[in-house]
Amino acid sequence: MAKSDVIEVEGKVTETLPNAMFRVELENGHEILAHVSGKIRMHYIRILPGDRVTVEMSPYDLSKGRITYRFK
């Protein structure tokens, strides 16, 4: 999958789940499951409920995504 096929949206973390998974509510009202990208995991960036994040989603499965950025 090429990088250009990725859909980037902003959302808010509503719930933390086991195995570094999060439930994220997107700006358009949809809720998805998202996991943490490797760079965020590598730099020990904590993600808590209420944080605003950027999520990358595949056009093939719009119910899952990857958290790529946490806003300050």
UniProtKB/Swiss-Prot annotation:
The keyword rRNA-binding appears for this protein: yes
Compartment(s) of residence: Cytoplasm
Family the entry assigns: Belongs to the IF-1 family.
Signal peptide: none
Gene Ontology annotations for the cellular component aspect, listed alphabetically: cytosol
Sequence ranges assigned to domain S1-like in this UniProt record: 1-72
Domain of life: Bacteria
Protein name: Translation initiation factor IF-1
GO molecular function: ribosome binding; rRNA binding; translation initiation factor activity
Keywords from the UniProt entry: Cytoplasm, Initiation factor, Protein biosynthesis, RNA-binding, rRNA-binding
Main function: One of the essential components for the initiation of protein synthesis. Stabilizes the binding of IF-2 and IF-3 on the 30S subunit to which N-formylmethionyl-tRNA(fMet) subsequently binds. Helps modulate mRNA selection, yielding the 30S pre-initiation complex (PIC). Upon addition of the 50S ribosomal subunit IF-1, IF-2 and IF-3 are released leaving the mature 70S translation initiation complex.
Major localization class: cytoplasm
InterPro entries: NA-bd_OB-fold, RNA-binding_domain_S1_IF1, S1_domain, TIF_IF1
HAMAP family associated with the record: IF_1
Keyword Cytoplasm listed: yes
PANTHER family tied to this protein: TRANSLATION INITIATION FACTOR IF-1, CHLOROPLASTIC (PTHR33370:SF1)
Quaternary structure and partners: Component of the 30S ribosomal translation pre-initiation complex which assembles on the 30S ribosome in the order IF-2 and IF-3, IF-1 and N-formylmethionyl-tRNA(fMet); mRNA recruitment can occur at any time during PIC assembly.
